[in-house]
């Protein structure tokens, strides 16, 4: 098995791709001579190309294909491109497929790869009939486990047991330099904790956002009582929401530089003493940089979405959570969390007693 070609299937989303990386690092450490190829969609393509344990990254252009197939003019060209994609995939002659995604499209890719060993999860742990495409099925425990643990357990299909895993996201030097310049400009003091706050989410995950006024009051208190430097981070669509919070604050805060990649964002978090935010991809990036995280959970599962490293969970049980109800208008689970709850959690994880 040492010289095998292995295909990894975890196509999206960014947070789930990130949570698969520790498993691949462990696999490479235990089987150092294997060649690892990963099929992934944007925006995770650049992130994976920067990670040394991955030998090749193949971009899966799902959105472009979905657009092309809509018109008669573009349909045949798109179908031809799909056929070529599959032919090129089969030419790689993969020995093993690890399907971490567990949905129909990853199952189809696994089958069309032509690999003789296709490792996936058993029926109850997959969706859309994915289990039909694997010939080695890994059974997961009935109790809830984190996504990190779920991914580690798939390696049992290769006879690997994961214990005490360690992981740090690799940041290329070209992504370290611009962030270093930003932090050097503010001469961070060893006596002032730098706290990164990421209040936003993607447009599809607004139901996970804590209240902006609560973030503003919390940030003020962190400055006033902990003498913290507050650094707000944001995604492409989140700047307006961050500015609303900053304008409502009475104390000064900083806006992190716009990051061009997930690894640049990781470098920002590496230089901070703490991350505060919701259950998002950036939270998992911070945890994989070794930065302690304080996570505000509303409608999502705090066990399944547990961070990798040192963390503290802030959550209120309101009877209906976790539910992942994207259309919920009440958001009782988030409104029940007060600034005092997050402030206490912050002091606890930082080891501060005042």
Each model region followed by its residue ranges:
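Catalytic machinery of carbohydrate-active enzymes
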Residues: 1-354
């Amino acid at each position: 098995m040492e010289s095998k070609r292995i295909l990894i299937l975890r196509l999206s989303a960014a947070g789930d791709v990130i949570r698969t990386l520790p498993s691949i690092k462990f696999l490479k450490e235990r089987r150092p001579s294997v060649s690892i190829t990963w099929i992934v969609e944007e925006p995770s393509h650049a992130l994976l190309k920067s990670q040394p344990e991955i030998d090749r990254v193949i971009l899966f252009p799902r959105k472009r294909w979905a657009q092309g197939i809509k018109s008669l003019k573009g349909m045949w060209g798109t179908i031809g491109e799909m056929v070529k994609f599959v032919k090129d995939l089969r030419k790689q002659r993969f020995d093993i497929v690890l399907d971490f995604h567990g949905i129909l499209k990853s199952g189809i890719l696994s089958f069309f790869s032509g690999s003789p060993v296709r490792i996936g999860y058993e029926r109850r742990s997959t969706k859309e009939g994915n289990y039909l495409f694997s010939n080695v099925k890994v059974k997961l425990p009935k109790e809830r486990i984190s996504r990190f643990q779920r991914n580690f357990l798939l390696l049992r299909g290769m006879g690997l047991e994961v214990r005490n895993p360690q992981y740090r996201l690799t940041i290329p030097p070209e992504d370290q330099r611009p962030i270093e310049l930003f932090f050097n400009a503010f001469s961070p003091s060893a006596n002032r904790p730098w706290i990164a706050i990421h209040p936003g989410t993607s447009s599809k995950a607004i139901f996970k956002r804590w209240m902006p006024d609560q973030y503003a009051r919390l940030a003020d208190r962190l400055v006033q009582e902990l003498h913290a430097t507050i650094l707000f981070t944001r995604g492409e669509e989140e700047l307006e929401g961050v500015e609303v919070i900053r304008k409502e604050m009475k104390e000064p805060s900083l806006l992190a530089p716009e990051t061009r990649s997930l690894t640049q964002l990781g470098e920002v978090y590496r230089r901070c003493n703490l991350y505060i935010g919701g259950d998002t991809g950036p939270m998992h990036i911070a945890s994989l940089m070794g930065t302690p995280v304080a996570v505000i959970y509303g409608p999502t599962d705090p066990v399944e979405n547990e961070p990798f490293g040192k963390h503290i969970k802030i959550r209120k049980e309101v009877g209906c959570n976790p539910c992942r109800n994207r259309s919920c208008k009440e958001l009782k689970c988030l409104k029940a969390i007060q600034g005092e709850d997050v402030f206490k959690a912050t002091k606890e994880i930082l080891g501060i007693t005042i």
